[in-house]
């Protein structure tokens, strides 16, 4: 249990219990919680951050099935020499699946389109693509791509990242579980570790909003019933 907590340091007992159940471990939630606390295991606090001063608004488009709404956004980090790189993420807002990512020092509209093309080959095109107003996303070339795939572009209001809350949540999760604990040698090292983390996240990370299923488990369950 201590080893598990060490490798999942942002998981509380509920998420850990859900994961244990999925692996066939039979134990009641109250018993698991008692053991978790007896071992002195707690969710490690995040670093302090400035609180939001604006209200949390409801998204303008709500996904009600897989493939309806994808969200795309950038995240930044640096290697051990302090050289900054960008990570572009695409997630499915309904299943929370991490569908695609790309790691580069610089990234323009052409790179975004190439990543989206690969995601479409694997999953089909989304009905809606949610993004902020960054130059890579509002570029005419991305608009043409969306038109060719019958995809509506949904841009969030400037300066209001909480409208892209699903992908922001992914950013926080990856920073907590991967970026803060690793020093990347170069881009290939970052790509390898992020790729491995993405696989674990999709297959193993329980979400309370998904009934404590992982994104892949939830997608499979939905497909079985629809």
Language-model regions, residue ranges each:
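Charged DNA-binding/catalytic regions of mobile-element recombinases
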Residues: 1-226
């Amino acid at each position: 249990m201590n080893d598990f907590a060490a490798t999942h340091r942002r998981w509380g007992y509920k998420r850990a219990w859900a994961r244990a159940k999925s692996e066939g471990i039979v134990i009641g939630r109250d018993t698991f919680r008692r053991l978790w606390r007896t071992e002195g295991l707690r969710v490690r606090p995040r670093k302090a951050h400035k609180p939001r001063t604006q209200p949390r608004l409801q998204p303008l488009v709500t996904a009600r099935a897989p493939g309806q709404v994808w969200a795309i956004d950038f995240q930044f980090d640096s290697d051990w020499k302090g050289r900054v790189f960008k990570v572009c993420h695409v997630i499915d807002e309904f299943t929370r699946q991490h569908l695609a990512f790309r790691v580069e020092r610089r990234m323009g509209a052409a790179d975004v389109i190439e990543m989206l093309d690969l995601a479409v080959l694997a999953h089909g095109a989304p009905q809606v693509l949610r993004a902020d107003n960054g130059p890579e996303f509002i570029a005419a070339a991305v608009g043409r791509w969306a038109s060719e795939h019958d995809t509506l572009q949904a841009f969030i209001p400037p300066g209001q990242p909480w409208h892209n809350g699903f992908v922001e949540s992914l950013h926080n999760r990856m920073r907590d579980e991967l970026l803060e604990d690793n020093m990347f040698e170069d881009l290939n090292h970052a790509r390898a570790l992020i790729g491995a983390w993405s696989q674990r996240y999709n297959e193993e990370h329980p979400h309370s909003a998904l009934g404590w299923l992982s994104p892949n488990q939830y997608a499979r369950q939905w497909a079985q019933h629809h």
